[in-house]
Structures are given as C-alpha cells and as structure tokens.
Regions:
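Short acidic DE-rich linear segments
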Residues: 1-16, 150-164
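Short N-terminal mixed-charge amphipathic segments
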Residues: 2-82
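Extended, low-complexity, charge-balanced
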Residues: 19, 27, 96-102
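Charge-dense, low-complexity intrinsically disordered segments
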Residues: 47, 84-88, 123
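Short, flexible coil/linker elements and helix-boundary hinge sites characteristic
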Residues: 71-72, 88, 146, 160
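Intrinsically disordered, low-complexity acidic Ser/Thr-rich regulatory segments
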Residues: 79-96
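C-terminal charged interaction modules
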Residues: 99-164
C-alpha cells in the first residue's frame, strides 16, 4: 500500500481527522504491591519532570508545615474539639497535596499510590508524599540513564565509521 493509499485510508475515519502515531511517548505500566487494581502508568522518559519537581516539592513541604502549625491545640482541648477543627483542615491539605503530586507526574499517582490515608501521613521517617516521590523519581532516573546510554551507543556507532 502506498503512502497516498495509507493517508486516504486514515482520513476515511468518521470525524475526517488523520491520526498520526509518532510513538514518542511511551508510558510504562507499574503494578503496586502486586495489586492488579493498582496499575500506574508513567512516561518515565519525561524530562520536564525536572522542571516540575522543585516547585512541587516546595509547595508540598509548605502545605505540610502549614497543616502542622494549625494542628497545635491547647492541652485542655477535647477530642471532639480537635477532630472538629482538624478534619476539614487535614482533608483540604490532602486534596491540595494530591493535586500537586498528580500534576508533578502527569498521572493519577495519588489515587493509585495512596488510595487511603493522606499524603502527609508519616511513613518510614518521612511524609508519605516524600516516599512516593523518592520511589517514582528513581524510576525516571533509571529509565533516563538507560535511554541516554542507548543514545550514546548509537552516536558512538555512527561516528566510529567516520573516525577510523
């Protein structure tokens, strides 16, 4: 089939739009804790995450600090009083943190990685959001190192024939 035939076949779709698949975005699928209901899809070749990481992390730390400072209750406060004041604050903080994390990774990370609990829950001596970011950014680092090595090998192969 020639190029024109292929283009005609593609343009005969119901909406008349020609679909082009460049295959430049390769999302990888990760299963969390062996749970088939917790599949995370990430484009671990997305270098723009470097631009998003620092501002997102600063916002998350600021939210955690603000929530902690507002959780200072007097020693004589009743459990009901603490819960009444803390619940909406913590819920609102968690929603903001989840939105930031999802934007950072350009995926539904918060729901898949932390379906219950909150992003500021303590986990292994750090906030849950910190643990999630550490684990996921390591996936990006490993993939990007691998991709850059492939590029280096390809460039080396092509330049070798001209230098020897």
């Amino acid at each position: 089939m020639g190029l024109l035939d292929e283009e005609k076949r593609l343009s005969d779709t119901d909406d008349g739009i020609v679909d082009i698949d460049l295959k430049v975005t390769q999302k990888k699928r990760f299963r969390l804790d062996g749970d088939n209901n917790r599949i995370l899809e990430l484009d671990t070749s997305d270098l723009s995450i470097l631009n998003r990481l620092e501002p997102a992390y600063k916002k998350l730390l600021k939210l955690a600090k603000e929530a902690s400072s507002k959780m200072d209750f007097s020693d004589d406060a009743s459990v009901e009083e603490v819960l009444e004041k803390a619940a909406p604050l913590l819920s609102n903080t968690d929603k903001k943190m989840r939105a930031i994390i999802d934007e950072l990774f350009d995926a539904n990370v918060s729901e898949v990685c932390a379906p219950s609990g909150s992003m500021y829950d303590p986990f292994n001596g750090q906030f849950r959001f910190e643990h999630i970011i550490d684990v996921l950014t390591n996936l990006y680092t490993a993939n990007l190192n691998n991709e850059f090595q492939k590029m280096s090998d390809r460039i080396s192969k092509h330049t070798k024939k001209y230098t020897h």
